[in-house]
Amino acid sequence: MPTILVSALEASSNVHLEELRHNLPKDYRFIGVFEGKNALYSPREFSVMGFRDVIGRLGFLLKAHKEMVQLAKQADMVLLMDSSSFNIPLAKKIKKQDPHKKIMYYILPQVWAWKKWRAKSLEKYCDFLGAILPFEVGYYQKKAQYVGHPLLDEIKYYKKDIKGETLVFMPGSRKSEIAKMFPLFVKAAQILEQNEGFKRRVLVVPSFFKGLDLKALYGEDIKLFEISYDAHKSLFEAEFAFICSGTATLEAALIGTPFVLAYRAKTMDFLIARMLVNLHYIGLANIFYNALNNETPGLGESQLHPELIQHFLSVEGLLKAYEEMDRERYFKESLRLREYLASGSTRKIANEMAFLLNLT
């Protein structure tokens, strides 16, 4: 019975992990940080955003880090997913503790956007790097392979045309995101009803919010929406979506649902990020679309969907994006994006895990 130490702190990473587990033998035992049984911590306990938020929880993060290093002694291999600020130092300490411990990094840090030096650290401390973006392999010397994209395994619904019956609202998976995005989405929904008549409004809620008091999280205005825990099905049925930045934007693009990306960070966090990251776009679909058109990812002129960031974000901007988007062009180009990513990644990662465990 192989034991795998997992560090999956993000909601999206846990969706990918769940799909991966369906493709692994049932006798694989998971320990560490993930959503599920036998976890040391739930990813919800790491749900912080912004530099000040991290500083406020530094004691907990250091404690969890130390416990994960100790837990690695029980594992046959280590699987790290995303969350580079936590996982790269973790890889370093585990490798120092046991140089023979096999470490896989799946869902790589965005070294193409900032901190390119992290690529050297990853190759030094990890044994296999599973890249889910075709262009990011070029930032590594030898250990990175493009394995496909996990969303192409997970998405079961793809639009055949641009039609839809609902408006979908996805204000994020973190409390800080919801607090900023949801009030704007509510106002946009109300104005759209005044201008165009009633349309079904669907609020997509993260699956790990099940059992929680949603009214306490979203406020009284949640009553204006139908609630869905199935993002893919809801996007498939939608005419248009209003989405907080994140994996959901790429999901919408692959499914073929027109959308606008909306995001607003704390002013200090935004200014620090602007100094560290040189990108025109923050949406994965736009970044991939640049690469697809042979442009520098995140810095190209081509755009698949509108982005409303920081002071450019307003209710008026959301409404304008809804009204003016060229839906037919968007749908045609979203099909090209799906072809660019080529295939899913889950089986490839499962095979590589078996190889690292000497099971093949």
Swiss-Prot record:
Enzyme class label: transferase
Reaction catalysed by this enzyme: a lipid X + a UDP-2-N,3-O-bis[(3R)-3-hydroxyacyl]-alpha-D-glucosamine = a lipid A disaccharide + UDP + H(+)
EC number of this enzyme: 2.4.1.182
GO MF annotations, alphabetized: lipid-A-disaccharide synthase activity; phospholipid binding
SUPFAM superfamilies to which the protein is assigned, alphabetical: UDP-Glycosyltransferase/glycogen phosphorylase
Pathway involvement of the protein, from the record: Bacterial outer membrane biogenesis; LPS lipid A biosynthesis
NCBIfam families the record matches: lpxB (TIGR00215)
Protein role: Condensation of UDP-2,3-diacylglucosamine and 2,3-diacylglucosamine-1-phosphate to form lipid A disaccharide, a precursor of lipid A, a phosphorylated glycolipid that anchors the lipopolysaccharide to the outer membrane of the cell.
Annotated HAMAP family: LpxB
Name of the protein described by the UniProt record: Lipid-A-disaccharide synthase
Native organism: Helicobacter pylori (strain P12)
Source organism phylogeny: Bacteria, Pseudomonadati, Campylobacterota, Epsilonproteobacteria, Campylobacterales
Gene designation per UniProt: lpxB
